[in-house]
Swiss-Prot record:
The gene is folD. It comes from the Bacteria. Homodimer. Belongs to the tetrahydrofolate dehydrogenase/cyclohydrolase family. It catalyses: (6R)-5,10-methylene-5,6,7,8-tetrahydrofolate + NADP(+) = (6R)-5,10-methenyltetrahydrofolate + NADPH; (6R)-5,10-methenyltetrahydrofolate + H2O = (6R)-10-formyltetrahydrofolate + H(+). It comes from Wolinella succinogenes (strain ATCC 29543 / DSM 1740 / CCUG 13145 / JCM 31913 / LMG 7466 / NCTC 11488 / FDC 602W) (Vibrio succinogenes). Keywords: Amino-acid biosynthesis, Histidine biosynthesis, Hydrolase, Methionine biosynthesis, Multifunctional enzyme, NADP, One-carbon metabolism, Oxidoreductase, Purine biosynthesis. This is Bifunctional protein FolD. GO terms for molecular function: methenyltetrahydrofolate cyclohydrolase activity; methylenetetrahydrofolate dehydrogenase (NADP+) activity. One of its GO terms (biological process) is tetrahydrofolate interconversion. GO terms for cellular component: cytosol. PROSITE patterns: THF_DHG_CYH_1, THF_DHG_CYH_2. Its EC number is 1.5.1.5, 3.5.4.9. Pathway: One-carbon metabolism; tetrahydrofolate interconversion. NADP(+) binds at G164, A165, S166, I189, I230.
């Protein structure tokens, strides 16, 4: 069993992004810019936003956080996005989820200009991903693919099973693996006999937010297990969705939690922001 070290790879990617940002700045006078919008004061969301801001600073990317109160109306949020869409200093726009219940999340994500949608949630980018036409892929699934690539794990011809069908992780993960020529199965809350699917997986990706959902008997020997879940237990410890102690000895590769997929999400966001800046320079937006 070998650990897929997302922390180490994320540092490699961050260093490469920093180098490319320096080249872009020195050759074209351009510094990539990321705007993050945070509505409300959810502690977990604030922590994620702070992590993104620190990563941007380390990589030389200009970042700004717009903190808006919980009482912010949908129209106020849409107006803030419109201003950022037209801001020449901003290449990427990210709205931290979840949003308060009175705001229509789909409408907000659709309001972000597709060429600034570094989260890859705009329907145009979702469609491009599904059709394998480029665009922006969501950061977490993109980070998983980079991990597989780093460790020489080729999805082509393999049975890939994804547990969790969210728009943020599960569905784009399935699209990326399908684009890489894996035979892809997407499981969700209504899937019958989950184990019968997971036991057939050469590559198993799990992201639902349930500690110990995947146990040793549900995984075949030699599988690659990607634990995308992150759960804080009552004792304060962080665990994934996979029972690591029992499953790990059975795997060829497995991601730890923390230190696996999490750091890769931030690294992929930096990559997407750099990509947005480069694309904007090559194809000026009207």
């Amino acid at each position: 069993m070998q650990l897929l070290d997302g922390k180490a790879l994320s540092l490699e990617i961050e260093a490469k992004v920093k180098e490319e940002v320096m080249i872009l700045t020195s050759s074209r006078g351009v510094t990539p810019g990321l705007a993050v919008i945070l509505v409300g004061s959810d502690p977990a969301s604030q922590a994620y936003v702070n992590m993104k801001a620190k990563a941007c600073k380390r990589a030389g990317i200009y970042s700004i956080t717009h903190e808006m109160p919980e009482s912010t109306t949908e129209s106020q949020l849409l107006n803030a996005i419109s201003i950022l869409n037209n801001d020449p200093n901003i290449d990427g726009i990210l709205v931290q989820l979840p949003l308060p219940k009175h705001i229509n999340t789909a409408k907000v994500l659709e309001a972000i200009a597709p060429h600034k949608d570094v989260d890859g949630f705009h329907p145009q980018n979702v469609g491009r991903l599904t059709s394998n036409l480029g665009g922006f892929a969501p950061a977490t699934p993109m980070g998983v693919m980079r991990l597989l690539q780093k460790y020489g794990i080729d999805p082509q011809g393999k049975n890939a099973v994804i547990v969790g069908a969210s728009n943020i992780v599960g569905k784009p993960m399935a699209s990326l693996l399908l684009n890489a020529n894996a035979t892809t199965t997407l499981c969700h809350i209504y899937t019958k006999d989950l184990a019968s699917h997971t036991q057939n997986a050469d590559i198993l990706c799990v992201g639902v937010g349930k500690p110990n959902l995947i146990t040793e008997s549900m995984v075949k020997k030699g599988a690659v297990v990607i634990d995308i879940g992150i759960n804080r237990l009552e004792d304060g410890s962080l665990v994934g969705d996979v029972d690591f102690a029992s499953v790990a000895p059975k795997c060829s590769y497995i991601t730890p939690v923390p230190g696996g997929v999490g750091p890769m999400t931030i690294a992929s966001l930096l990559e997407n922001t750099l990509k947005a800046a480069k694309t904007r320079q090559e194809t000026p937006q009207s």
